[in-house]
Amino acid sequence: MADFQKQKVQWFPGHMAKTRRQIKEMLPLVDGVVELLDARVPYSSANPELDSLVRGKPRIMLLNKCDVADPAATKRWIAAFAAQGKTALAVDCRSGKGLSAFLPTVQQVLKKTIEKNTQRGMAGKPLRLMVVGIPNTGKSSFINRMAGKNRAKVADKAGVTRQNQWFAVGGGIELLDTPGVLWPKFDDPEVGDRLAFIGSVKDEVTDLETLTCRLLEVLGRTRPQAIIQRYGIEVDEYMQGWEILEAIGRKRGFLMRGGEIDYNRSAVIVADEFRGGKLGRMTLELPE
């Protein structure tokens, strides 16, 4: 476990390359794009290939899971995006928090499209939006919340595969669901780590013990009080991740035969509790 710093996170299965091609092919069918980001890592969860893929389509960014992110940091991110001319909303798609602003925002961002439709005698034409994002950012939760329990699939459009379905969500809006897609290589290893921390990279393709040690080392430097309050152990900024994980395992009684720490069980618990917000509301990166 001592060499955990040397391992890098990478994950780009073949189906993601296919999804990327499908997104490009389906863009002519939509009026705009809704991008789901994780509010805890807005930079790392933004696919850097999207700007070139969407080719200038109007875009709305949803900073999802804002309920487990630092609210002050989320405000800073929204302001930073606004300074770049991008529209961003803080939402929690599971509870519906913040989504009341979505329809009015669509009307505002797609104002020119609506006016153009009216001039062409197509007033009331449904606005079609493609929903994109990396895995585990909440695209399905967003569509389920917007469409309701009895969500109605719109008839398949030309060029749309069975994995990419349209849903009518009211307000004259149709959403096109797409599978989560990453990009081929994380140039910054910290981006790969953060995506693995939040579960956007499958645990099966990482060493969860190694990953959790990295997470605990980050939190030990930046949010030691969160670890202290949750696990009742002493932490300082000089402790290595494996030392913190060991202390947590011992405190929780995760022991194997002979009194050895069960590192895997400890890692699973810490990762799950971090992702579920049980260590408190926190954001792992801030805008420059």
Go through each PLM region and give its residues.
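Canonical P-loop GTPase G-domain recognition
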Residues: 67-132, 151, 254, 261
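Glycine-rich phosphate-binding P-loop
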Residues: 128-148, 152, 178
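Short, structured loop/turn "capping" segments at alpha-beta junctions
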Residues: 113-117, 144, 150-156, 222-227
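Gly/Ser/Thr-rich helix-start
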Residues: 97-99, 134, 139, 160, ...
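Structural beta-sheet core signal
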Residues: 35, 61-63, 131
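Helix-rich effector regions associated with P-loop NTPase G domains
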Residues: 1-33, 40-49, 53-59, 66, ...
